[in-house]
Amino acid sequence: MLNRNFDLDIKSNYSLEKSNTFGLDIASESFFIVKNLKDLKNILSENKTKKITVLGGGSNILFTKFLDGLCLKIGLKGIDIIEEDKNNVVIKVMAGENWHDFVLWCVNKGFGGIENLSLIPGLVGAAPIQNIGAYGVELKDVFISCNTVNIKDQTEKEFDQKNCLFGYRTSRFKTIDKNIYIITSIKIRLTKEKHKYNISYGSVKQEIGNMEINLESISEAIIKIRKSKLPDTNILGNCGSFFKNPVINESKYFTLKKKFPSMPGFKIEKNKYKISAAWLIEFLKYKGRSIGNVGVYK
């Protein structure tokens, strides 16, 4: 039996169909929406022997069978400006906020730095776990710190940018501290003036065309590009784009480039080149290919 505090609204045998972007009707033994830190600590403390599954936007998970234990849906809400001067603003965002909605909030306020991360699915709390990034921008570029709760002993801990050990789509929360902490909020620093626009990707530059380059036009261009590549999860269940662009050494890059001249790629550091996973998928004719009930979108 699940240990429960009767003040907490814990659901039993709860369908996760509307809690994952594949829309799979898999049930969880127990389900609870976390709306404040007190409830989070209480429910963790009372269920130390249970398997805990932390669920955000449900876009990075594939349910295949009945989910044993307790599923915690992060519902912590709130956006607060905690520091501000003429040029910059520091914002604290709770983990349960929708990432894309938060990006649009920032764009509408004239705060720059994450407009390239428009329409990335999921919640704010998941953003540091894999250091989300797109079109030349990563979360670490604006990240200050995140607050966490330890699943085992319910202690709170803050990790600054350096201690998050960010890498290409990774962090300590995905490696050495996987399943140890629940991220409850993040702090980021954005610009109010003298924004540094990034339209280095050809598709973004092409989509903007002759429009004025600003926060709105970049965000709108990226939203349009993303929508053209991926189906609406309400129409066709999917997990979005999760492929990492392969990083290879210089020798390998030029060998492949000579053999496949159309292969896109660019230098990221000494002796390291990044090539396009999207190009590889299409070149190898996996775009639109299905095997059984699993497929790559056309």
Positions of the model-derived regions?
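Anion-binding (especially nucleotide phosphate/pyrophosphate-binding) glycine-rich loop
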Residues: 1-152
